[in-house]
Amino acid sequence: AVDRDWAEKIFLPYDKLLANGRVVHGTALAVRGTTVEVSGHGQIEADYLVLATGTAYPFPAKHMESSSVIAKARIERVHTNLEHSSRVLIVGAGAVGIELAGEITSAFPQVKVTMLEAADRILPAGDYKPEIREAIADQLAQRGVEILTGDSLSFLPPVDVGVLSPFRVTTQGGRQLEADMWFRAYGSAAA
């Protein structure tokens, strides 16, 4: 959403992925040996079966739109919104949130970014050395990113992710946060 050219690079039709084989998108109803019954596709016999359920990430890391045209338009709207924003809230300071904060402050240096992390430190998951966390926090601080840890939102912002609409939210710790738009950078899960 930060890089205008990114959307053109990430959407690839699945039917062009394999030279010897095909991609079938559907719900597996039954598996018997090397045969899978897939809703809308009937029974499919294969030498090898790959069950790739994927991972669900919040937008803009992953798009749920069924059409790349719709997804690309949404990304373009977010980019335009970032151009007109002065304050962005990123909820979550794991790897995704940190990357997003870096991208936003690089492409839009006029935007003030606040990161809110429920855990007591950035990069809460994983076995990161304290020196790594400190170095990343220092780099973000040099970019003007405010990092708030050990606190969480009392309620989600009253606007959708990536939409430009100024709002105010309160954290569980009583902080009042104001932003023009927000991003959810937590909650990845197996699909």
Regions found by a protein language model. Give the residues of each.
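Glycine- and other small-residue-rich loops at beta-strand/loop junctions that grip anionic moieties
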Residues: 67, 93, 125
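A Rossmann-like FAD-binding core segment of flavoenzymes
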Residues: 23-26, 30-37, 110-191
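Beta1-alpha1 glycine-rich phosphate/pyrophosphate-binding loop at the start
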Residues: 1-22, 99-130
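Short, surface-exposed alpha-helical segments at coil->helix boundaries
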Residues: 7-12, 72, 76, 130-137
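FAD-binding core/adjacent interface of flavoenzyme oxidoreductases
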Residues: 16-89, 172, 176, 183-185
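Glycine-rich, phosphate-binding/catalytic loops in enzymes
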Residues: 66-70, 107-108, 132
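Rossmann-like dinucleotide/flavin-binding elements
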Residues: 58-60, 73-117, 189-191
